[in-house]
From Swiss-Prot:
Electron transport system for the ribonucleotide reductase system NrdEF. Keywords: Disulfide bond, Electron transport, Redox-active center, Transport. One of its GO terms (molecular function) is electron transfer activity. This is Glutaredoxin-like protein NrdH. Disulfide bonds join 11-14. Residues 1-81 form the Glutaredoxin domain. Pfam families: Glutaredoxin. InterPro entries: GlrX_NrdH (IPR011909), Glutaredoxin (IPR002109), Grx-like_ET (IPR051548), Thioredoxin-like_sf (IPR036249). Gene3D superfamilies: Glutaredoxin. CDD domains: NrdH.
Amino acid sequence: MSITIYTRNNCVQCHATKRAMESRGFEFEMVNVDLVPDAADTLRAQGFRQLPVVMAGDLSWSGFRPDMINRLHPTPHAANA
């Protein structure tokens, strides 16, 4: 499953989401909307109003959401850690 986290500079919830995903062994791509303004426009058009926005397969959400992160399946090396 492909996971993308849309972030911005100095975003506390973005950093918390990144740390939570890393601690569970997920691989993901990060897109900084401060550097990619078109990404911010696309997210707004999709109804997102807060960062981070996480897109993981058919799931997507905004904000730091440990409950949603826990719904994802970790990679095998994290499950054995």
